Each structure stands twice: as C-alpha cells, then as structure tokens.
C-alpha cells in the first residue's frame, strides 16, 4: 500500500514534473504528498576562500546566495501551491484522521545537500518521486543515485513532460536478480491497480532458475495480475535502451526495474 509519497523539490525546472507525478500517484492511492524543498547552504551556493578576498566582499557573496536560496524556495512553493490546488489536496492530518479517501499534502523546507538529505527522509516514505531535466542536473542525478542505493525505498522517476495518468499500463524489466525482485515487490500496488503487466526480458539475460519470465508470470497470477511476455532484442543498443524501447512499443507508461 502506498500512503506517503516524498516529493523533493529544489526551485528548478524539474519541480513541476516531479510534483505533478507525485500528485497523480497520490490520487490513484488516496495518499499523502510530503513536499520537501531542499536548497544548499548559502556558503555552498557561493563557495569562497576566506583568505582570498576581502571580508566585506565575502559577506556580500553570501548575502546574494541567501537571496537566491530564498527565491528558489519561493519558486518551488509556488509550483507546489498550484499543483496541490489543482488536485484538491487538503492539509495533512495526523493519527487515525489521516487514513482517509482524499489526497493530502504538506510542505517543508530545509537546507543542505540534496543527495544526503533525501535518502534519509525517504526511509520514512512509501515512495520517492524525483524528476530531472532532459539534459540532466548533476545535483539531481546524485540524489537519484543515493536514493536508489542508500534509502531502501522505491524511486519513481517522473517523465519530463506533463502526463494525465501513470501506471495504467506497466511493464517489468525482468532478469531474475534480487534487485529486480525487490522492484516488483515494491511495485505491487501499481500492478494490482492496473491488473495487468508486460514482462520484458532481453536476449542477453543470464540463465537462472528465477530468470525465466514464465516463473514471474506465475508469481504475479497469485496476486490476480494478468501478464504477457515480450522479448527485447538488444543488438547494438544499451540494455536499458532496448528495454525502454520495447516498453514504449508495447504502449506501456511505467517501466519497473531494479537499480
């Protein structure tokens, strides 16, 4: 069950995509969105060597960085207010009253390293939603990697453009590995809601008892999920590109895979 969704924001372009996806998921599961705005300490925005420039100039640089930090937080808050309002999210409640059939949300702000803060916060969430620009941002990319490897929680990478639904036609990239199995287990709420899934495997997959996609299909049938199996030909492509391409060809809107 998905009840809490952590949606980190930074005041940059990916915020709208990340929050939009988080609220779509929240609507699907009547869940709570925990929007967390993380901005660097002013000293990190304006790295300076104290001995290299006069103190008044150093203070001015930190002041400018502080102003930029405030602008970033205000920008992220504006996007949050717009999207949460569009989805009719109510302020969060606690205790038994929090278990409801409506979307709730709250807003928090903190300063520090995105890649350090988000994995720790993620451990107290059911799902993390992050987005990045098509060209990628180094800070966000680092946060994505640390969430995958250090949080112990599933990560949903939001599409860069606007979408009206997500998880209605899921696919699983299956190779029988432990990380793939954990991804499937974490995605069961999506799979049960959809009731169907495409199982993808590649012609380069290593043989193994659990790697057989038919075995996964049998497991999912116990959860009431209808499956179809599709082979993705790698050829000269990266495995990830082959899987993504095959999922798109099958009309899927969510690809589930291990990190």
What are these regions (language model features)?
Residues 70, 74, 112, 181, ...:
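Electropositive phosphate-/nucleotide-binding environments in soluble metabolic enzymes
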Residues 1-60, 150, 165-233:
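Small/aliphatic-rich secondary-structure junction motif
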Residues 40-43, 51, 78-128, 223-255, ...:
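Structural beta-alpha unit
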């Amino acid at each position: 069950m998905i009840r809490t969704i952590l949606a980190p924001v930074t005041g940059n372009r990916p915020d709208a995509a990340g929050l939009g996806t988080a609220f779509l998921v929240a609507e699907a599961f009547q869940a709570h969105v925990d929007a967390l705005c993380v901005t660097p300490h002013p000293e990190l925005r304006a790295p300076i060597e104290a001995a290299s420039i006069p103190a008044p100039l150093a203070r001015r640089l930190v002041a400018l960085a502080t102003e930029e930090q405030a602008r970033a937080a205000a920008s992220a808050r504006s996007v949050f207010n717009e999207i949460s309002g569009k989805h009719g999210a109510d302020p969060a409640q606690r205790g038994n009253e929090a278990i409801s059939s409506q979307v709730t949300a709250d807003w928090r702000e903190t300063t520090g390293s995105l890649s350090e803060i988000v994995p720790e916060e993620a451990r107290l969430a059911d799902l993390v939603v992050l987005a990045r620009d098509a060209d990628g941002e180094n800070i966000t990319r680092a946060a994505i990697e640390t969430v995958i490897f250090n949080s112990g929680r599933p990560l949903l990478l939001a599409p860069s453009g606007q979408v009206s639904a997500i998880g209605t036609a899921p696919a699983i990239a299956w190779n029988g590995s432990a990380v793939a199995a954990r991804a499937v287990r974490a995605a069961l709420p999506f799979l049960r809601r959809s009731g169907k899934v495409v199982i993808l495997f590649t012609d380069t997959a290593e043989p193994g008892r659990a790697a057989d996609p038919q075995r996964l299909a049998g497991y999912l049938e116990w959860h009431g999920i209808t499956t179809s199996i599709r082979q993705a030909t790698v050829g000269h492509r990266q495995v990830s590109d082959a899987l993504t391409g095959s999922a798109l060809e099958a009309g899927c809107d969510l690809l589930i895979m291990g990190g």
